[in-house]
């Protein structure tokens, strides 16, 4: 009990920080100095922020408007965009910053004074977005834009001694800034540590020391060893040292990372410090050459080509220089196709190679520190500075799990969100209330969101695929996928995570209350009567499983989900959706998938003393199994309507059906094994064992649901010992490969070594990797596995090269504007509990509509005086991979997320870690 008050006070402090962030998002602030820190002993770092946007809001009018959805009209001294199915709502415009940092002035090293002396020899700067909004542009269309934060590095003529200093700014940009430098108090920018904390028992506790200075010597890399910084300490709230250790070099800037998922162990970056030269011609027939008058490139060098196809070509082509002449350069090893012609503005410059960090990375391992009491602590690099405060609490991972569960709650569809997890929103997608859901004859498997990808999902509501019927009143619920609002069968992976936690966790943890609704609160009160005492995790699993149970047809088949016929319209909230909404036709794969999870739920309900409810789900699972079995035995008949739609809509001809059929059959056969293993574990029936063993004894793997099949079989009452041993060895070998990859990874990651980087790979672990870690740990008890889980989650929560938490609502420095369309439309703070995808290859987010001409939000071409101060600097292709996080919602591959790829797995892993903490 003695530890309760400090924990409460920290949580209160974090809540206040969160409130201030939320308040700041609603009212513009002036151009301001956000923080003065120390980067290296002889480099001061100052963060400057442009004013943030003043948020607009959604207002309801007395009647409908004649203008179409998306039109801007004058209203009350501002502009509003018409939204909503009845056109009786306006989304009032956000107000962009009125003042931007003058970058040309801030970069003038000779104009600074420190204590009146010209001791600043160089200025380096990194400018990235931190806030965003939208409004009506001068042309009358909707315009998105960003506000920038600037990390300004001031190189000194000598190391900074402890003391009080006054900094005078060039051009009187700011009043004189007085700051005190104390290595035991001043934050060191390069300490990359958790923004959240640890439990005392955590097997692994690590932080990192890394700084990249854009345009600085040695390609911006910083070797802290050259400063003699060799020791670190842990300080308690009084400033006393409670632990000390060595600062150890972990990675060099050019250390190869063979498992980075980028196709090469090192990455090409645009070199800073020299001007790009114009490319005025290209020849691609035969040996590819470019015409570059005045170049000085040498054979064998790497170069980067940009804007080859014009202002909206925001990608880069890296290549090797072959033969050279005075005006031409032969292009070898081009990483992507070259265009037949080039446009004005195309450039070439040298490139360098480095790893994802692009700098020296030092590790501070304090795993041996076992604090005896909860409290607030900091890391100090002796002689440099300190980290942000982090909390030690026995409830730490429980709290992180609760926050992530709150993130899932904040994505529930079909109910009003009541603010219990920091976000309020009216009910959305309720048939008969604010939406009509049409039945489509397009199966999910045939759509662009399914296996075949033959039909754009948007077409599912057009005349080719409409059968004229509306879905029933029960077609509500489930999770919204992420930034958009679709509810897909894949979301059942989240339910599977929570059902498995019921098997993994000690009994006392199953009694934990996370504050989520009981099933009887929103679902059928008769069906779920007397279930309130079930574990919260079971209620959370039921939420999505029940949704798909209600999508089950009379014949037992399952629909793949519900979706809008297009991505969300900017400024339109989910509860004011104007696009057509449809439900996919049943498909065999979705039906097997549901049979597996419903059977698993029935087993758990039986174990928790709910036999009647268990029967409901077991009967539903059996009907799904039988329907899928009938379908797979005659795919021609099952998909006859869908094939007719393909032909009628011109997506395929009848001759393409055999190949399509084969792909559908392969997917269904795999998911048949998943369902059979689950149902065998639940029922013990021989027919399910036979169906499972037939494939499991072959060349099986653990990709996503296939891992479920292996795990369910291993945990069944009677098994073939050879198959079981083979599957157990598969879990162990896959995990061993994952652990081996950490030896060369700059920062820990649960990305599968063979998975390509991006879309979360290398950031939050997906459900498959989360299950792999938990299941292998259950088999082996190997603490190295939980150590990797701890390192990965701490990396997401701040121990990364940005020093930011990638989880909304957690951390002093956190992501504020993920691609969550409701908060953007409503003009409010993003809901807590979202974990974004994070890092991705620069070419993967080279969107021309973002990094293009002057009309784009982060323009790089044809710059006006305004857009000159709103572009990312330095070049996106010069910033190291782990620094290159663009906090702008429409950078989809970084700023989006899904309930099953990021939020659900992080929730499950945090709760699993909580289960490893000794009970009070």
Regions found by a protein language model. Give the residues of each.
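Boundary at the C-terminal end of the N-terminal hydrophobic targeting segment
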Residues: 26-28
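Low-complexity, Pro/Ser/Thr- and charge-rich linker/hinge segments at domain boundaries
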Residues: 181-204, 386-425
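Acidic, glycine-anchored loop motifs typical of Ca2+
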Residues: 523-533, 537
């Amino acid at each position: 009990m003695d530890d309760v008050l400090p924990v409460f006070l920290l949580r209160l402090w974090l809540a206040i920080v969160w409130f201030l962030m939320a308040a700041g998002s609603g009212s513009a602030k002036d151009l301001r100095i956000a923080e003065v820190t120390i980067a290296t002993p002889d480099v001061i770092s100052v963060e400057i922020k442009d004013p943030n946007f003043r948020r607009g809001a959604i207002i309801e009018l007395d009647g409908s408007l004649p203008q179409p959805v998306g039109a801007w009209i004058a209203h009350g001294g501002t502009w509003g965009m018409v939204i909503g199915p009845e056109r009786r709502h306006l989304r009032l415009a956000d107000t962009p910053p009125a003042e931007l940092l003058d970058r040309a002035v801030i970069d003038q090293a000779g104009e600074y004074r420190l204590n009146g002396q010209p001791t600043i020899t160089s200025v380096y700067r990194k400018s990235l977005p931190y806030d965003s909004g939208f409004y009506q542009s001068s042309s009358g269309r909707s315009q998105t834009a960003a506000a920038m934060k600037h990390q300004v590095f001031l190189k000194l003529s000598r190391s900074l001694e402890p003391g009080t200093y006054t900094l005078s700014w060039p051009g009187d940009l700011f009043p004189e800034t007085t700051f005190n430098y104390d290595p035991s108090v001043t934050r060191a920018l390069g300490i990359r540590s958790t923004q959240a904390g640890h439990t005392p028992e955590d097997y692994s506790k690590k932080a990192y020391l890394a700084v990249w200075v854009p345009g600085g010597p040695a390609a911006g890399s910083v070797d802290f060893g050259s400063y003699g910084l060799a020791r670190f300490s842990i300080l308690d709230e009084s400033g006393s040292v409670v632990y000390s250790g060595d600062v150890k070099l972990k990675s060099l800037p050019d250390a190869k990372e063979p498992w980075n998922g980028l196709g090469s162990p090192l990455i090409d970056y645009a070199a800073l410090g020299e001007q790009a030269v114009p490319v005025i011609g290209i020849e691609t027939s035969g040996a590819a050459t470019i015409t570059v008058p005045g170049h000085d490139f040498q054979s064998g060098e790497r170069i980067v080509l940009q804007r080859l196809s014009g202002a909206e070509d925001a990608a880069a082509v890296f290549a090797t220089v072959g033969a050279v002449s005075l005006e031409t350069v032969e292009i070898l090893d081009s990483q992507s196709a070259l265009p037949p012609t080039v446009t004005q503005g195309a450039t070439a410059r040298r490139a360098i190679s480095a790893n994802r960090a692009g700098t020296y990375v030092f590790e501070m391992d304090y795993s041996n520190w076992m604090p005896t009491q909860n409290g607030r602590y900091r890391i100090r690099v002796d002689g440099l500075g300190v980290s942000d405060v982090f909390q030690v609490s026995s409830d730490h991972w429980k709290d992180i799990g609760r926050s992530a569960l709150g993130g899932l709650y904040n994505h529930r569809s079909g109910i009003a969100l009541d603010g219990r997890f920091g976000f309020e929103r009216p009910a959305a997608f309720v048939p008969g209330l604010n939406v009509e859901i049409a039945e489509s004859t397009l199966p999910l498997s045939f759509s662009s969101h399914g296996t075949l990808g033959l039909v754009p999902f948007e077409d599912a509501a057009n005349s080719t695929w409409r059968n004229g019927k509306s879905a029933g009143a029960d077609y509500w619920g489930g999770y919204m996928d992420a930034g958009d609002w679709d509810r897909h069968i894949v979301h059942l992976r989240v339910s599977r995570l929570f059902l498995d936690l019921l098997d993994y966790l000690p009994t006392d943890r199953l009694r934990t209350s996370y504050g989520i609704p009981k099933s009887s609160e929103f679902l059928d009160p008769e069906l779920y009567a007397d279930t309130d005492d079930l574990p919260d995790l079971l209620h959370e699993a039921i939420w999505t499983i029940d949704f798909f149970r209600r999508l089950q047809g009379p014949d037992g088949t399952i629909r793949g989900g519900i979706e809008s016929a297009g991505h969300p319209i900017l400024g339109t909230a989910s509860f004011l959706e104007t696009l057509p909404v449809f439900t996919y036709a049943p498909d065999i794969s979705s039906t097997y998938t549901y049979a597996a999870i419903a059977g698993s739920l029935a087993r758990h309900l039986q174990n928790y003393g709910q036999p009647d409810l268990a029967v409901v789900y077991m009967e539903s699972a059996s009907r799904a199994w039988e329907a899928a079995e009938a379908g797979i035995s005659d795919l021609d008949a099952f998909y006859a309507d869908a094939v007719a739609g393909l032909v009628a809509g011109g997506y395929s001809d009848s001759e393409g059906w055999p190949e399509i059929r084969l792909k559908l059959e392969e997917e269904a056969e795999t998911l048949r094994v998943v369902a059979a293993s689950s149902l065998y574990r639940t029922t013990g029936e021989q027919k399910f064992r036979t169906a499972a063993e037939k494939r499991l004894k072959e060349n099986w793997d653990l990709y996503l649901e296939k891992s479920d099949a292996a795990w369910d079989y291993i945990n069944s009452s009677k098994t073939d010992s050879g198959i079981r041993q083979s599957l157990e060895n598969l879990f162990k070998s896959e995990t061993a490969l994952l652990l081996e990859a950490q030896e060369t990874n700059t920062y820990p990651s649960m990305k599968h070594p063979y998975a390509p980087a991006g879309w979360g790979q290398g950031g939050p672990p997906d459900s498959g990797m989360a299950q792999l870690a938990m299941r292998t740990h259950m088999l082996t008890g190997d603490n190295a596995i939980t150590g990797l889980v701890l390192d990965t989650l701490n990396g997401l929560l701040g121990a990364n090269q940005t020093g930011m938490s990638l989880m909304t609502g957690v951390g002093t420095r956190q992501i504020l504007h993920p691609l969550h369309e409701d908060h953007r439309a409503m003009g409010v703070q993003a809901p807590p509990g979202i974990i974004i995808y994070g890092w991705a290859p620069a070419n993967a987010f080279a969107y021309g509509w973002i990094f293009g001409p002057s009309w784009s939000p982060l323009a790089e071409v044809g710059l006006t005086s305004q857009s000159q101060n709103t572009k990312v600097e330095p070049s996106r292709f010069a910033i190291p991979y782990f620094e290159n996080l663009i906090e702008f919602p429409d950078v989809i591959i970084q700023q989006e997320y899904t309930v099953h790829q990021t939020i659900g797995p992080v929730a499950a892993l945090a709760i699993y870690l909580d289960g490893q903490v000794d009970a009070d």
